[in-house]
């Protein structure tokens, strides 16, 4: 519990890194569209070149989001996080922009459907419980999730879909079922998230958003 409180305090500190901090560091956020619905979002200079750990700037980071594949399931047309990394204090702004982009072009944003670290899960817990400007939407199991839980988990778990007549919200829950068994739907990782484009609007107004 103490570690969780410390993490939340750190996350609140990170969330304070806003547009003014970008201006102070002369850094931009670039949204690079790759394919129809795949995006790379990163901190950059004014020419859209990514900042890195080797630059003089202390601001660097990126997040990659992609449309779900056939194995993952429709996921309510949400885009999935497939990679995220940033300098300390600069992660939340990238996540917010990624969520806003994913909301505009699809059904929002979901965590990585294959593997999520404990620290990353805490980020999603924070979105679910502490961010009033973020909306969560429950996703469902896939047939593969149900089959795997009954055959391979010890002891076996008999699961049922929440919305058996709706396929569009099916989304791989391998990570949540393995960790939470029949309470998988209580996990922050079992959902998709949407958000109004307030961060992107602020970045545009400050001339700090590059869209390729």
PLM regions and their residue ranges:
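Terminal substrate-recognition subdomain of acyl/acetyltransferases
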Residues: 16-38, 59, 63-73, 103-212
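Alpha-helix boundary/N-cap detector
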Residues: 3, 7, 93, 119-122, ...
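A short helix-loop-beta-strand connector motif used in the catalytic cores of GNAT acetyltransferases and
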Residues: 34-53, 134
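Glycine-rich phosphate/pyrophosphate-binding loop shared by adenosine-nucleotide-utilizing enzymes
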Residues: 48-64
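Conserved acetyl-CoA-binding loop-helix of GNAT-fold acetyltransferases
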Residues: 84-103
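Conserved acetyl-CoA binding element of GNAT-fold acetyltransferases
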Residues: 68, 72-86
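Protein-protein interaction and targeting regions used for scaffolding, dimerization, and localization
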Residues: 1-16
């Amino acid at each position: 519990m103490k570690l969780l409180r410390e993490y939340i305090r750190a996350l609140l500190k990170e969330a304070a890194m806003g547009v003014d901090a970008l201006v102070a560091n002369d850094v931009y956020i670039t949204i690079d569209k790759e394919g129809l619905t795949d995006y790379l979002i990163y901190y950059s200079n004014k020419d859209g070149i990514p900042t890195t750990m080797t630059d003089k700037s202390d601001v660097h980071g990126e997040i990659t989001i992609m449309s779900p594949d056939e194995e993952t399931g429709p996921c309510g047309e949400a885009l999935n996080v497939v990679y995220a990394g940033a300098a300390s204090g600069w992660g939340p702004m990238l996540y917010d922009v990624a969520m806003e982009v994913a909301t505009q072009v699809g059904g929002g944003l979901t965590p990585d459907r294959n593997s999520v670290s404990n620290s990353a899960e805490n980020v999603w817990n924070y979105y679910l419980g502490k961010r009033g400007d973020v909306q969560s939407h429950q996703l469902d199991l896939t047939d593969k999730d149900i089959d795997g839980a009954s055959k391979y988990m010890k002891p076996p778990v008999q699961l049922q879909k929440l919305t058996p007549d709706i396929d569009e919200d099916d989304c791989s829950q391998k990570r949540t079922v393995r960790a939470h068994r029949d309470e998988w739907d209580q996990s922050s990782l079992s959902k998709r998230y949407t958000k109004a484009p307030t961060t992107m609007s602020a970045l545009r107004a400050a001339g700090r958003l590059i869209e390729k």
